[in-house]
Amino acid sequence: MTWSATLALAGADGEPVDLWRTLMSHGVADLPPNRIDEEARTLETTVAVPRGRPQTVIVREERDGKAALSGTAGKRSEAVLDGMRHILRLDEDLSEFYALAADDPDLQWVTQGAGRLMRSQTVYEDVVKTICTTNTAWSGTVRMVSAIVEHLGEPAAGAPADSPFGRAFPSPAAMAAAPESFYRDVARSGYRGAYLRSLAQSVASEEIDLEELATADPDDLSDDEVAACLLALPGVGPYAAAHIMMLIGRYSRLVLDSWTRPTYASLNGRKAKDTAIERRFRRYGRYSGLAFWLFLTRDWVAEPV
């Protein structure tokens, strides 16, 4: 049994959403259980469903400002639709950011629907994936995440054998139950294995609640406090913390690393100190990091002629 549904491509305040720019917003978005087809311009992902079996969903953009969703098995459910709204950040209001960008000649283009960084169903998943990006080539990241999803993720109906696709990202309990040998010999995650297992155990036992970091009001939990919480996690350093903060909607910090610095220098025509880069985007306030990221990644999507 298959099903179909549509979602309006609009933010919380009715602002436009560019689906393709959302799907292409950062590299981690293409890690299993996600699969982006650049030729067909679609996203395939498998979402966990409370008290039910995971469902694999294919998302594509329609011409009338909607996203078309099709389920490969099972029945349509609000839980799946809510999961996709969350992943695509359709519940986020970027109107304040767009008002700032409209006055910046370098970033006026984002007001047409850019700026939604595709996220995972859970903060936990984004933290695990980010840890897997540290101190390794991209091929190593893909290998680690693929093994974790393939061997520990719950399959949707019809999931192919020996594949990370068609499976939901594993729960903290599933990752905590995996032996050290899995992380060493199967995922081949090196020193990260101990970090991933420790993190999974802490989340599964409810010693740590990562999800509250994404839902807490900034007035109650400041960006500095969120950063401190993330830096206290095993395997999370300054780069990983800044990346995770972007994915949970805390955009005040710029991700300054070995890719962003030279990319900014190339686009800007000259090298710049970190303080100068931060000063350039300071006018965006709590959106400074998002503005910086979009400045760097505009050419990731070809613009209409």
Feature map (PLM): residue ranges:
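HhH-family (HhH-GPD) DNA N-glycosylase catalytic core used in base-excision repair
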Residues: M1-V305
